[in-house]
């Protein structure tokens, strides 16, 4: 009897958490944990290593993080601003700030037209540092109503001014003097005070200042005319908003953000005065999953950072039982026509930013809840020398009856499994385990060696390489057995410094018995 083959293309689809099976395709994944879609394959995501190998004194949460000039600058939960070096704290720039305040940083031009770093936390006076002085200083000329513990939580550099927000009002500095909010040319604007609770976020995009309110409301300021009397404020959308200041990222020519209702949106696709789902990225595939697995009440602490090296946006969020950002939902945009989601539970990211590594690449770094700053996506697939789980899991599918109406097959007849063949890039003489599920139950595990190019264990066939000792692409096959209506495959590896890169899986089968 001729063997039929069903090919599962790895890397063609991403995480799909839909509860409707009609919206799940065989190329998609029901679990994509600590996985990467590099090279349009399934790989273990890059590792993590400590930037400061000595803990910051007191082991505080890293509540804010940025790179400024040659420094890595962190705000900590014990009210400090410090530079971070291998040995922990390089310089303590400020003490005595409010405890446990989410901090934001913005680099812009100060009063002397030199680059300066501005720190906001919504509680203390805005801090300014030039990268030379031994400490930060409070902004010299704030608006009169920035007093006591009422201060902006975020600033935005836009059209050669610094802009900041409190309640329903946006403040702007003197042109080209970002420390001066009282001089000629400075001022403030009310943004639809009868709508939403307050402005929580802003970003400069497409030559406009965009403002987001909690729980709903997107607005923009058109300030392109040099005469301020001609500036205009417009409502863009009244049904979508945000929870906090950092859940937004500019990615090439678009802005992506996490809404207060747990959807990820493209600002370029949010229609003016549009409906609640306008601009949402695959809401049917990832929206419910995000809302079911993450804590709504902590969306105000969510952070989004665009990682240009791999064309990914990383959203740091908190799971339903957590108190800090302990999940990363990653939107992979390297194939802009087919965006894909994946997620990670490996790292705590109370703060997240980019930094420049020794090869001048912009890399991701996160600040945890225990006094450490970590580099992500390291070449070695370990976290501080320890292994971590990497799991891919297909939907449950039937090889028979696949169609547009039945994207996972009909399951009307049994098939007798013959083999599973994996096409992969050799990564080393270690194993990838694949659990085989039949009709909803775990049945057995098959193991694929990820580096041999010839020979193998009984029941394993390895072929397709160009030379002995390994090639760029290899195939390896394992015998399967059992008759089932529906099959699911779950692959995993959790060993330090072991990797895999799977391009496709081919399931060989023949017609099974007709017993019920």
What name fits each language-model region?
Residues 210-237:
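Surface-exposed extracellular loop regions of Gram-negative outer-membrane beta-barrel proteins
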Residues 152-177:
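Carboxylate/His-rich catalytic cores and anion/metal-binding grooves
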Residues 168-194, 228-231:
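Short, flexible helix-coil linker/hinge segments at the edges of structured domains or between repeats
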Residues 82, 127, 171, 218-219, ...:
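WD40 beta-propeller blade core
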Residues 143-145, 162, 185-194, 278-297:
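Surface-exposed loop and turn segments in beta-propeller and other repeat-based domains
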Residues 59, 148-149, 194-197, 242-243:
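Short loop/turn positions that demarcate and connect the beta-strands within blades
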Residues 130-156:
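Asp-box/WD-like beta-propeller blade repeats and closely related beta-sheet repeat scaffolds
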Residues 1-117, 238-255, 260-516:
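Beta-sheet repeat architectures centered on beta-propellers
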């Amino acid at each position: 009897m001729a063997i039929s083959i069903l090919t599962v293309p790895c890397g063609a689809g991403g995480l799909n958490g839909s509860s409707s099976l009609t919206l799940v395709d065989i190329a998609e994944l029901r679990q994509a944990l600590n996985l990467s879609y590099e090279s349009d394959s399934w790989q273990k995501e890059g590792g993590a290593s400590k930037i400061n190998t000595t803990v910051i004194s007191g082991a505080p949460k890293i509540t804010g993080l940025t790179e400024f000039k040659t420094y890595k600058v962190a705000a900590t939960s014990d009210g400090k601003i410090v530079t971070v070096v291998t040995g922990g704290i390089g310089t303590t720039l400020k003490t005595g700030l409010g405890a446990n305040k989410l901090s934001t940083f913005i680099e812009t031009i100060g009063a002397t037209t030199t680059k300066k770093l501005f720190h906001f936390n919504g509680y203390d006076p805005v801090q300014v540092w030039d990268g030379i002085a031994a400490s930060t200083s409070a902004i010299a000329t704030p608006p009169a109503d920035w007093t006591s513990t009422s201060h902006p939580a975020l600033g935005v550099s836009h059209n050669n001014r610094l802009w900041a927000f409190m309640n329903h009002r946006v403040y702007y500095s003197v042109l080209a003097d970002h420390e001066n909010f009282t001089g000629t040319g400075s001022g403030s604007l009310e943004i639809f005070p009868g709508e939403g609770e307050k402005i929580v976020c802003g970003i400069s995009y497409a030559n406009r200042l965009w403002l987001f309110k909690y729980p709903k409301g997107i607005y923009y300021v058109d300030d392109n005319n040099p005469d301020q009397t001609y500036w205009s404020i417009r409502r863009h959308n009244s049904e979508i908003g945000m929870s906090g200041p950092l859940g937004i990222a500019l990615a090439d020519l678009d802005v992506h953000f996490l809404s207060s209702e747990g959807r990820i949106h493209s600002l370029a696709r949010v229609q003016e005065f549009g409906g609640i789902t306008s601009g949402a990225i695959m809401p049917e595939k990832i929206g419910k999953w995000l809302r079911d697995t993450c804590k709504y009440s902590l969306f105000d602490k969510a952070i989004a950072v665009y990682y240009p090296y791999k064309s990914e946006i990383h959203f740091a969020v908190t799971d339903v039982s957590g108190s800090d950002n302990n999940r990363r939902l990653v939107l992979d945009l390297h194939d802009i026509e087919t965006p894909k989601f994946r997620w990670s539970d490996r790292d705590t990211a109370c703060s997240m930013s980019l930094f420049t590594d020794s090869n001048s690449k912009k890399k991701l770094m996160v600040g945890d809840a225990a006094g450490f700053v970590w580099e992500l996506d390291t070449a070695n697939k370990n976290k501080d020398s320890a292994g971590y789980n990497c799991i891919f899991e297909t939907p449950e599918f039937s090889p028979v009856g696949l169609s547009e109406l039945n994207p996972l097959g009909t399951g009307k007849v049994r098939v007798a499994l013959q083999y599973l063949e994996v096409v992969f890039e050799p990564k080393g003489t270690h194993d990838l385990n694949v659990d085989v599920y039949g009709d909803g139950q775990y049945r057995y595990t098959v193991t694929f060696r990820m580096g041999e190019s010839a020979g193998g264990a009984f029941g394993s066939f390895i072929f397709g390489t160009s030379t002995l000792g390994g090639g760029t692409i290899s195939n390896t096959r394992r015998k399967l057995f059992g008759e089932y209506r529906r099959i699911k495959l779950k692959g995993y590896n959790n060993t330090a410094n072991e990797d895999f890169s799977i391009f496709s899986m081919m399931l060989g089968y023949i017609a099974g018995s007709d017993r019920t």
